[in-house]
Amino acid sequence: MIHTSLLPEITIPDTLLTPYVLQRAERLADTPALVDGATGRTLTYAEFAGAVKAMAGGLKARGFGKGDVLAIMAPNVPEYAVAFHGTAWAGATVTTINPTYTAHEVQHQLKDSGATLLVTVSMFLPIAKEAVEGTGVTEIFTIDPSDASPMTALMGEPLLEQVEVSPDDVVALPYSSGTTGLSKGVMLTHRNLVANLVQTTAVLAVDEGETMLSFLPFFHIYGMQVLMNNALAQGGKVVTMARFDLEQFLQLAQDHHVKRAFVAPPIVLALAKHPLVEKYDLSRLESVFSGAAPLGAELAEEAAARLGCEVVQGYGMTELSPVSHSTPKGMYKPGSIGILIPSTESRIVDPETGKDLGLGEDGEIWVRGPQVMPGYLNNDKATKDTIDDEGWLHTGDIGHVDADGH
């Protein structure tokens, strides 16, 4: 049985990622786009778009473009979005690296992705220098002052138009740990990421000027898409946190009148139980959205009761750009990951027999839609094991669908 979304079908625009993300930048020129939570340092939409185009111009002048890969290994800071979209505007591909990786793990990703430039911060420079040995990386740049080249050295004459590439070209290469061995490069195209941004507006619409408090790392697909790209495309204000600190999170949520918090289950636990929460005014909070790992119904209820707002879940994976299920406002159900987002299909399949299962029966979740990756980089076997000939992505996760489509 094929399950379809309860929400109306949508049309996916035939556009590239960064033009889509910058669609409101001109109109919102003087509005804050990115704010460093720790210092208050701000990039307006005009400054953000200008920096993206200057970086793309600098990359193009170096002969860096389609088919080339720039790696980013940095915490969440405003310049992360500049490096990401400057690379995309130049027609190239970004691979995002977990800064907590060992030098060996970083080296694997640099080699496997074919990265030739690396953007990092001074704190991670020693690991970066060790990791680039024996890879194709020719130069390291840092966002903050260090003994490496500054990221500003990548800036050049602004490139006013996006370099022409196909929406089916790969723009992002996050790495997914998968279940075995070293992580695998997940090829995500412009079309994949734009599709998921449009699909999720039905459930994650952002008001212009609304603050998105962003401590979920941008190297991870949840932070990259649901926070950074989603908020910027809709005219939101992305307030970055380099790492999670409960007190700073609560202070920023209070100061910036945060309406929706995007978190993972350990943060829900803190919001439900930590005494610090009582010291801050979180009365503007309308919902807490938890992803990245399963959230128990009891904990969600406890946090919701304390905060006086909905605590809901979504579901996705890197290979799905990332969202396939989410909970629209007013549709909360305890323990549910929500309903299918628009233009997405799913099946619940018996992993032993491959037969479709009925309502209420647990089986493997399969997903099909425009957000499904074309495959893993340099790994046809893993791709064939994950996506079948009919385009169904076999998630490896177990769940069931109830009578209400949850």
Predicted features by range, described:
Residues D255-V263, A272-K333, E345:
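Gly/Ser/Thr-rich phosphate-binding loop
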Residues D30, E157-Y175, L182, A205-T211:
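Conserved pre-ATP/AMP-binding loop-to-beta segment of ANL
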Residues M123-P167, H274:
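ANL superfamily adenylate-forming
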Residues D68-V69, P75-T95, P99-A103, H108-L117, ...:
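A short helix-loop-beta submotif of the ANL/AMP-binding
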Residues T42-A46, V171-V198, T327:
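Conserved AMP-binding A3 loop
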Residues R62, M73, K355-G360, E364-H406:
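Conserved ATP-binding/catalytic segment of the ANL
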Residues V194-T211, F218-R260, K273-H274:
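Conserved AMP-binding/adenylation subdomain of ANL enzymes
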Residues A33-V77, A81-H85, T102-Q107:
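Conserved AMP-binding/adenylate-forming core of the ANL superfamily
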